[in-house]
Design a protein with these regions (language model features):
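DNA target-recognition domains and sequence-specific DNA-contacting regions of bacterial/archaeal
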Residues: 28-175
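Extracellular/lumenal glycan-associated surfaces
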Residues: 8, 26, 183-195, 199
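Short, tandemly repeated low-complexity microdomains enriched for cysteine and small residues
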Residues: 22, 63, 198-208
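Short amphipathic coiled-coil heptad-repeat segments
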Residues: 1-17, 201-210
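Loop/turn elements at beta-strand to alpha-helix junctions within RNA-recognition modules
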Residues: 17, 156, 177-179, 192
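Non-catalytic DNA-recognition/assembly elements of restriction-modification systems
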Residues: 11-40, 179
Length: 210
């Protein structure tokens, strides 16, 4: 039986190749996270930064810049020697593996972190692509409705929901082969997200100025 080609209906001009579709476990490797609580973090004493699952759920957008001031530091007395090989890089992805609502599984893509020291913290699943991806593409795809529909039946728990590494590995990742097309898609969704945020801020100000 001939394999059906994955060709989106809407494309940027100049791109015609079918998209790839591969299992998560084929194109990502898992990294090590730590289990530091909020008590081990601060915002005053510069040190190694730490991405906490709660911040992924509440504070961070799909694309996270390493210079973001909402990323806390790890207290200087904490021994981080065993995490020396777990420092994050540009393009790495971090999932929140637990939540009290349907935001479980939210993912962020890291950018501008290569010159920094950043680790993945409590209740997170950090992973690194094994193949190149265009800037911004994965952060948007992994939070898209089509991907999150795959996650929904894999979530466990009632009051507190969670998702596991083993569940993620069989989900399907869809992407254009061309990195330029990937980056155009990433840029488009970044622009849309910024416009939505700006509109929400304007609506908030308008409400309280009346």
């Amino acid at each position: 039986m001939k394999e059906k080609k994955l060709v989106p209906k809407l494309r940027f001009p100049g791109f015609t190749e079918p998209w790839e579709q591969r299992k998560f476990g084929e194109i990502f490797e898992y990294l090590r996270n730590n289990t530091l609580s909020r008590d081990s973090l601060n915002y005053k004493n510069p040190n190694v930064k730490n991405i906490h699952y709660g911040d992924i759920l509440v504070k961070f957008d799909e694309i996270l810049d390493g210079s973001n001031k909402d990323i806390p530091y790890i207290n200087s007395e904490v021994d981080l020697s065993k995490f020396s090989k777990s420092l994050l890089r540009d393009g790495d992805i971090i999932f929140s593996d637990t939540a009290e609502d349907d935001t479980v599984g939210k993912a962020i893509e890291l950018q501008n972190v290569n010159a920094l020291f950043i680790l993945s913290g409590l209740h997170t699943i950090p992973c690194r692509p094994l193949i190149p991806f265009g800037k911004g593409y994965l952060g948007n795809f992994l939070n898209s409705d089509s991907y999150r529909l795959q996650l929904r039946p894999l979530v466990q728990g009632i009051k507190v929901s969670s998702i596991s590494k083993s569940a993620l590995k069989d989900t399907m990742i869809e992407y254009p082969k061309n990195l330029d097309e990937q980056e155009k898609i990433g840029s488009l969704f970044y622009y849309i997200a910024k416009m939505i945020t700006l509109h929400q801020e304007e609506s908030f100000l308008h409400k309280y100025m009346l």
